Regions:
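Sec/SRP-type N-terminal targeting helices
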Residues: 80-84, 97, 143-171, 184-207, ...
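N-terminal signal peptide c-region/cleavage motif recognized by signal peptidases
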Residues: 13-15
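Periplasmic alpha-helical coiled-coil/stalk elements that build and connect Gram-negative outer-membrane
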Residues: 96, 206-330, 467, 491-494, ...
């Protein structure tokens, strides 16, 4: 008796543990039957007020590059959309555990029937029977491949037949069954493959997210430098307008004194009008750049920040390190850090798991089967005896009920034991063979993809490094051109004052100076863009900017 009870505990222990793991929270059923939440609450832009400062002309947003990128990471809509891809991949892991979810079921029916008697052995002229079966079962697939079930069934039967010893008759049965694969689907290594695949795909998604965010951060930083360039270009054009106004005023005084021909006044007037147009165009470009910057950091979503001026603290500094880049070192760093290359390599891990899954599908299906049932019988017992005259006599009634049936069932005195082996062997499993072939082809294809990405990484870094070197030289030459433009203007002004030159050449020198200053701004920003692009191509942009993806 004790050994049978111990056997019962061993058999039922997995089901009890499974139930505990399935319902870890008291709110389980509340979550199941709760109304689904379909309304989405979008958060308002955050932390914008942290960078508000009071200036002479009112409040403004003062942003360094770091503070601006912090706002971009907090409020950029495209980055928020990209992050959701990770949630989908995490949900796929949860879904991969679903084959191991236990399943509980219950069934109760009540059937009453009246049938005419066809023989005296039925014990009544009209047989009236009430049958009430109830069944409760619990089943689960374990990571080892074992599929087990535990079920309890009880049936209460009442009848008006005079030949029944039990009325009502209560029959109970406790059944344990299992199926253990021996070849196909055997062991945790095979049955947990979908979970491993989902986790590996999550890592692929995380690498792709990092690559996507890196591109979005690059776009956002380019918007920052667009605004810096527009701001400094406006300053250059305003300075050019001041020079044009000074030249026009001087020409007007000379015209009044008769030192200039009336026909020569049109050139400085035309020059001043051109400078005004350039200033208007620069202001328009500045407004456009500010609007683009607001979109990147989510300020356009908050009415309180849509029209607040933006003050950027970064400038167009001259590069100090003019030493050439070690291109091969940059390539090695890119091969180490590029997230798209990491994602491509991670896909190979997914392919290996897919091949293992396909190999398992092609194996023969050999399973060990087991079945054990313990039965019990109870109810009011009517002993029937036949006297010498052949009449059936009912003896004293022995009361009974469900307890008798359950005690007899747990006594394990009336068992049914069954063991067996089942083999399912497809003669030609073409679908599984095709799946295995496809998985092998996918592994080869993705291996070639890794090689292609490596080639692309190298080319990207070489191109980006060349752009950095070219930008350095362009900034250096722009400084030289600005120095010559300043000297040229000074020389033309002195010659004009001495009467050896005309106003046309002075105006031409002024325009050359404006063009040189504008070229210096453009080349300085182009250098910053090229450095930014190199960081993007080596995969170090987020680390360099101190950005951590949560």
């Amino acid at each position: 008796m004790l050994s049978r009870f111990f056997l019962l505990l061993v058999i039922t222990a997995p089901s009890v543990c499974a139930q505990i793991s399935s319902f870890p929270r008291p709110s389980y059923f509340h979550e199941i039957f709760a109304r689904p939440v379909t309304q989405v609450q979008l958060q308002a832009p955050a932390h914008l007020s942290d960078y508000l400062v009071e200036g002479k002309e009112g409040k403004k947003l003062e942003l360094s590059l770091k503070s601006y990128l912090d706002l971009v990471m907090a409020n950029n809509t495209d980055i928020a959309v990209s992050r959701l891809t990770v949630s989908v991949a995490e949900n796929a892991i949860t879904r991969a555990f679903s084959p191991f979810d236990p399943f509980a079921s219950g069934l109760f029916t009540s059937t009453q029937s009246k049938t005419p008697s066809s023989t005296v052995l039925q014990g009544a002229s009209t047989l009236d029977t009430l049958t009430q079966p109830a069944t409760f079962s619990f089943s689960q697939l374990l990571p080892t491949g074992t599929n087990y079930s535990v079920s309890f069934s009880g049936t209460k039967t009442s009848t008006n037949s005079s030949y029944q010893n039990y009325d009502p008759s209560i029959a109970t049965a406790l059944t344990f069954s299992f199926t253990q694969p021996l070849i196909k689907n055997r062991g945790t290594g095979v049955n947990r493959l979908p979970i491993l695949i989902a986790r590996s795909r999550l890592r692929v998604t995380e690498y792709n997210l990092r690559d996507s965010v890196m591109q979005l951060v690059m776009n956002a930083e380019n918007a920052y430098w667009d605004l810096v360039q527009a701001r400094d270009n406006l300053k250059v054009q305003e300075k050019g307008l001041e020079l044009a106004n000074e030249a026009l005023k001087r020409s007007q005084r000379e015209l009044e004194l008769g030192a200039m021909s009336p026909l020569d006044i049109y050139q400085p007037e035309q020059n001043r009008a051109t400078a005004e147009i350039s200033v208007l165009q620069a202001r328009f470009a500045l407004d456009q750049s500010e609007d683009a910057l607001r979109k990147q950091m989510g300020a356009d979503l908050d009415p309180a920040f849509r029209h607040i001026p933006i003050a950027l603290t970064e400038g167009t500094e001259v590069p100090t390190d003019m030493s050439p880049l070690d291109v091969e070192t940059e390539v090695r760093r890119a091969l180490q850090y590029r997230p798209d290359l990491k994602a491509a390599n991670q896909v190979l891990d997914v392919d290996d798991l897919q091949i293992r899954t396909a190999k398992n599908s092609i194996m023969p299906d050999l399973s060990l089967l087991g079945f054990y049932t313990s039965q019990g019988q109870g109810g009011d017992f009517y002993p029937l005896t036949t006297n010498l005259s052949g009449t059936t006599v009912v003896g004293p009634v022995t009361p009974g009920g469900v307890g008798d049936a359950v005690n007899q069932m747990f006594g394990f005195g009336y068992p049914v034991i069954e063991f067996g082996v089942q083999l399912r062997l497809p003669i030609r499993n073409r679908a599984a063979a095709a799946d295995l072939a496809d998985a092998t082809v996918a592994k080869k294809r993705d291996s070639l993809t890794v090689r292609s990405v490596e080639q692309t990484v190298r080319l990207d870094v070489l191109t980006a490094a060349s752009q950095v070197e070219s930008s350095k030289n362009s900034v250096k030459l722009a400084h030289v051109a600005l120095d010559f433009a300043q000297k040229y203007l000074a020389a033309e002004q002195k010659k004009y004052e001495l009467g050896t030159s005309q106003i046309y050449f002075v105006l031409q020198a002024q325009q050359s100076l404006v063009n040189a200053e504008s070229a210096l701004v453009q080349n300085s920003i182009a250098y910053k863009r090229s450095v930014l692009n190199l960081l993007r191509r080596t995969g170090e942009l987020l680390d360099e900017r101190g950005i951590q993806l949560q």
